[in-house]
Amino acid sequence: MAMSGRELVVYRERLGRFEEVGFVGTSEVALTFSYSDSYRRNDSAQSISHALPLGAGELPPSAVKSFFDGLLPEGSMRRVLSASFHTSEDDLHELISRLNDESAGALVFKVAGEDPAWGRGYEPMGDFDFERLAAFPREFAPHAAVRSRLSLAGAQMKVGLHFDAATGAWQYPKGAAPSSHIVKACDGGFSLQTINEAVCMATAVRLGFDAA
């Protein structure tokens, strides 16, 4: 089903290949989403959210907005990204199209006709990129997000990276290449935020829980 307004094709990666899931577009008043007919006929098809069921007809705009809004950064991270894209913080369609390799839900958003696997690979980090992230998180984290086109949900300044165990090198994921680590930086008035998280995770390990 074609959507009104600009259209993005939604893919999911399964068993080493990309499957077309549906379409994201815009109407005069809201973000829109529908599952593709081919995906509905797929025996392995699953809804991308309980709030967006496969068998439904027209999906409620409020549910569509809530789901896709939840895939995007929040707070100061979104403000900085929106400014760099010269768009509104509320323009979900534009933000998704710019940060189109969503990492949490295994979804990829591409313009119709664009290969979802195009540009997949890794780019080496600069020698001082970690120092820049720690010293200037507000400036560096959005820059890295634009560079890798990963959409990391939440309000913290964070960067999705890949560690190559064979070479010991840190890399930026490109295209739909997966990240192996999410690196966070302190932001604003919470200067010890990441230290607090590290202490909590270390405590969890000491108590017998599995934690990274």
Predicted features and spans:
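Phosphate/dinucleotide-binding and metal-coordinating scaffold of catalytic cores
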Residues: 1-212
